[in-house]
UniProtKB/Swiss-Prot annotation:
Protein's job: This protein is located at the 30S-50S ribosomal subunit interface and may play a role in the structure and function of the aminoacyl-tRNA binding site.
Assigned protein family: Belongs to the bacterial ribosomal protein bL19 family.
Name of this protein: Large ribosomal subunit protein bL19
GO cellular component: cytosolic large ribosomal subunit
Biological process annotations from GO: translation
Gene3D superfamilies for this protein: 2.30.30.790
Keywords carried by this UniProt record: Ribonucleoprotein, Ribosomal protein
SUPFAM superfamilies named in the record: Translation proteins SH3-like domain (SSF50104)
Entry keyword annotation includes Lipid biosynthesis: no
Organism: Burkholderia vietnamiensis (strain G4 / LMG 22486)
Database matches in InterPro entries: Ribosomal_bL19, Ribosomal_bL19_CS, Ribosomal_bL19_sf, Translation_prot_SH3-like_sf
Gene Ontology MF term list: structural constituent of ribosome
Domain of life: Bacteria
Length: 130
């Protein structure tokens, strides 16, 4: 491992100190809690939507979440290892066959729905035992 990769790995570990980032994939509905500073006040803002893309680039990894806000599509890019991210909660698993769901931008209503991924009972029991 070269020096840059080693430094990057140390920064990732420092960013994850005390935080856990759950496994999520494109198509999943997530709730991203973001620390927002307004003047001298700090609060947590929740942003819920569908993950349409994940970009894995080490420390520069990010993901795009899309939601419909009052009839208008809104996309927001989050840095995976940002100190502004308070937490990420996976609300629903989506069953998709693409890594990038940019086609959802042109769709609205029922055609923009994503099927839910059904997890078998064996996997659920194994996951709860771990």
């Amino acid at each position: 491992m070269n020096l840059i990769a080693k430094l990057e790995q140390e920064e990732i570990e420092r960013a994850l100190a005390g935080k856990t980032i759950p496994e999520f994939a494109p198509g999943d509905t997530v709730i991203v809690n973001v620390n927002v500073v307004e003047g001298n006040r700090k609060r947590v803002q929740a942003y819920e939507g569908v993950v349409i893309a994940i970009r894995n680039r080490g420390l520069n990894s990010n993901f795009i979440v899309r939601k419909i806000s009052s009839g208008e599509g809104v996309e927001r890019t989050f840095q995976t290892y940002s100190p502004l991210l308070a937490s990420i909660v996976v609300k629903r698993r989506g069953d998709v066959r693409r890594a990038k769901l940019y086609y959802l931008r042109e769709r609205s209503g029922k055609s923009a729905r994503i099927k839910e991924k059904l997890v078998s009972k064996d996997r659920t029991a194994a996951a709860s035992q771990e």
